[in-house]
Swiss-Prot record:
GO terms for cellular component: fungal-type vacuole lumen; membrane; multivesicular body membrane; vacuolar lumen. It catalyses: a triacylglycerol + H2O = a diacylglycerol + a fatty acid + H(+). The gene is atg15. The chain crosses the membrane at residues 10-30. GO terms for molecular function: lysophospholipase activity; phospholipase activity; triacylglycerol lipase activity. This is Putative lipase atg15. Disruption phenotype: Impairs atg8-processing. InterPro entries: AB_hydrolase_fold, ATG15_Lipase, Fungal_lipase-type. Its main location: membrane.
Amino acid sequence: MSQLLFLRRFFFLFCFIIRISCTGVFESVIKSSENVPDKVNVKLQHVFHYGLNEDSISYYRLDVAKKSVYAESESKLPLKMKKGYSVHLKDQSRDALTDYRYKSMKGIYSEANSPADLWEQEAIVIPDITDKETIYSLGKMSYNAYQKIPFDGDWLDLGPDWNITPPEGFGWEEDGLRGHVFSNDDNSTIIIAMKGTSIFGIGRGTSQKDRVNDNLLFSCCCARVSWAWSTVCGCYKNTYTCSQTCLEDEVQDDSRYYSASLDIFYSVKELYPDAQIWLTGHSLGGATAALMGLSFGIPTVTFEAPGDRMAARRLHLPMPPGLPDEESLVWHFGHNADPIYLGKCTGPTSLCWAGGYAMESTCHTGQECLYDVVKDKGWHLSITHHRMQTVLNDVIDAYEKLPDCSHTPNCVDCYLWEFPDDDS
């Protein structure tokens, strides 16, 4: 264990002990957890869509007709849960989040230093990430988030009847961000599954906007990988030099997926103010879910998501002081034959390059749960192994046990690059 990790663990443990015995570093909010169910079944309730066109930003909610969805009990998606805790901003309003991120950008707050009264510790229920059925169910939700609405393609166990919030016949093919909302019978548990990247048949319907957001979040500098490429922003300054200030401004623009994901979260929170929310998603959807999870201290399970730590830092997401990475509520499931998950889908010979994607980020927040399919199955590095259906059928379902989850210390993104601030 590195000295830095040891110090972070010690500091967090010290803060936690002090919180119990005297005034404390974190304010604690303990919700009643005596009757936490061991398992719940969830079904689709809503689909949220934020259209992010160049000239306008539109938002629609589609409500699923209850009589038509999951009529058979075996079609419900089971989730096993257990008790846990979350450390997050006490005030989770949009204004408070914006204020924290602004002060972090200005150097007033940092991962190691922010006022103790900003934070609270809350007892919650979290997914049992050692339960294969639970992970498979979350994977199914992530897979379903790709499907076009109304019925199309391989949507799993979905009925034909829909109630559509105006306008009627909304075009789901336009650029934007989608979140599919699942709930249990009493709406105490809500899962938001975010749609992933539409690339090479992996997903449908939003590929152009996905490419821009992928390249902003997961490339070192606006997808500046060759003189022949059209970059997605103008932050490049010189050879292996990129403006940090410019990058941070770009990822926080209202037309970007992170901003739209906040709209989805607050909309769901308004509908279900007392519910426990979890997040999931595949690829870009998984990374977007992880960024939301970090913003609010929400349990998040992703599948084959590209490294999200670089994006989290550029967005200046809330980081409780002293909280070790492995204590955050983000788990990234993936395997070692997926170049996107590993941050190796780069270079002129890669399909990412051919599609205009620069997937260069390597480091994940939280914990990585890695299947060794290279050793166990003889797979080779290929983007074809990135598809969610492949992950469901040939990895999660095929393995008897789930992989162990752990944080990868000393990970470095974009080690050749320098990122000066504009005023430095």
